[in-house]
Swiss-Prot record:
This is S-layer protein. The lineage of its organism: Bacteria, Pseudomonadati, Pseudomonadota, Gammaproteobacteria, Aeromonadales. Residues 1-21 form the signal peptide. GO terms for cellular component: extracellular region; S-layer. The gene is vapA. Monomer. Forms oligomers at high protein or low salt concentrations. S-layer protein. The S-layer is a paracrystalline mono-layered assembly of proteins which coats the surface of bacteria. This S-layer, also called A-layer, confers virulence to the bacterium infecting salmonid and non-salmonid fish. It binds specifically to laminin and fibronectin. Keywords: Cell wall, S-layer, Secreted, Signal, Virulence. It comes from the Bacteria. Changing residue 47 to S: In strain: A400 and A450.
Amino acid sequence: MFKKTLIAAAIVVGSAAPAFADVVISPNDNTFVTTSLASVTKQPVLDFSTAQQNLTLNFSEVGDLKNNGFIVLEIQGEGQFNDAEIRQWLSNGFWRRPFTGLLVNPNDHGNFANSGEVNDVRKFFKIISDGTQLTIVHTIDSNGKRLRLALASDVEETINFADAEVELKLNLANQAFKLTSGSQGTVALTAGALWNASYTADPVATKPLFKLGKLFQLSLTNAGKATALVSEGFLKLNIGDANISATDFAITNVTTNQTIQRDKVNLTLTGDVSAFKKDANGNLVNKAGASIGWKAAADGQSATAVLGAGNMAGGVQNALAAFGTLYVAADNTVPVPAVNFNVKAEIQGDSQATYNYFKDELADLFILTRDGMKFDTITTGTTSANLIHIRDVSNILPTEGGKIFVTITEYADHAANGRGEGTVLVTRKALSVTLPSGGAVTLKPADVAADVGASITAGRQARLVFEVETNQGEVAVKKSNAEGVDIQNGTRGTAPLVDFTL
């Protein structure tokens, strides 16, 4: 008898214990839509943000929802709920109209679809009337980060089924979220059921509802490339009488639903544009003579443009094919420089009311080089007494001479039959000295390193790759056993990399 009593008591206690199941939130896969917003959005604008993704909360156990308890939604990240907009979302608009922002489903063996009918919603939540419309009883607390939806006083009797569901139509919660301008990262929600100082359905986090990041982004597939020919005094290009064209140059509004006024976005092309064809007003033109949108600066060292007219909607990419074009005329008289052109797009905060200042930059929209000869030599540190003699025999270089570029790689200390990793110290930096037409230049490794700001460790092997703007040149390297020991080297398969090794 005693044993039977204990068993019966255990059954009673077990049946009274809360389920403590997790809320099941859907969707929770790659169909989830995160609303991307620009972190530079001004605060008065970002105060009123709308999520695009609707959520379904599934309470999988009978008893997850308790009489006079709450369904609790809490913001994770930098954000708050807006009281007036939440109230509007949780109201039905007029008397007995169905609710649209929040739907319910008791899931009685699959016999019900999600419903906003007043009688169905009332089975889940407490409802009050202001004489015009009905509103689900709710409270916002915890500094605006927590929203509590008040469950009905008899929800345990009316919703006595597993897998009861509440659908949150967040896309109808217009401007219900106040996000923080300047913040980076994501904002999500947790959802759970709370009663009597305990969670009866443990809260679970959603995927990010919001992501704050860039406003727009520049992109391209391939830079526009050309080589100025030394045989033509760098006045003409290896591509002939044709446009230099970048491939797939574009700008993308990376937000989900924010609009950008295109005439507020300014573009800047940085690099010497003196050699490119222009009209009488300084506007750069293509081979056909049509303006491509860039206007050269007075000093010729840059060009500017306005993105265009109209608006660019969220998620839209605009092709910028015209801006990705340059042209050197057949009768050009200005030597084309060796230069990498960078482009910047920016929007000023004082030019419009939605965004603070923002910019995005793209390196190497155009890459212009000059042809010439390449050679390399290996030296042991800056203690080397080597002398490098470079001569031009073309006699056709422009007045400013041919530039000399150097790339320096230093190798880690290693003994014979050992190995040492290479570290690139500088890449294709121009020396301050140029090669005169029909003239010569004499260089010391230590002076070369100092000229380009490189520090080579004494006694370490270093490879110096020279690119000289002459198509007819001679090089001689005087190797000496001074304080450092220099190495004569030959490398198999270097023909595509250098013309010769000394």
